[in-house]
Amino acid sequence: MLVFWDQRLAFLATPKTGSTAIAVALESLAALSIQRPPVLKHTTVHRYRRFVGPYLEAAAGAPFEVCALMREPRDWLGSWYRFRSREGVEPDRSTQGMDFDAFVQAWCRDPQPDFAAVGAQSRFLTPRNGARVDHLFRYDRIERFVDFLEDRLGCEIVLPRVNVSPTGVTDLRPETEALLRRVAAADFALYDAIRA
């Protein structure tokens, strides 16, 4: 999470949407940068609106706008699958030795096994009540997000390539694709509604 005080802007770091690269590029411009632990770095819109936002707004005497990125849901799960396939991941969270189809099927189960328990972007970006994210951008159109930030921050932004998931095959059988679209209907609906 990054907070830009003078611009009254907060960036929520949706997991697997380039948040590490954004932090590397912009941390020096932010009044507040929370990178650790992950539960704080990846503060949800609900937690922001309930805890962080009210504090910032009381201190500043003005409201803050909230921006975030969202990745296409299947691509987002593919990034998690590849990320957890790398060396050094705890065995119960590792996806080594399984294909993407099995990972997605496991993610669709309730309860999810540890290796597939990565949450959902719709839960991250949708509050239980109250205001949503003010400016939501598609990860596959990150240049629009960068343009928005350049305009708000008044500087050129170049995002480095850091914390990139390894490559891997992310094929799905048609029945698994259909299952994913049913289980992740809220994610697909939110993603499809993004105009930016």
Enumerate the language-model features and the residues they cover.
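Membrane-interface amphipathic segments in extracytoplasmic regions
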Residues: 1-196
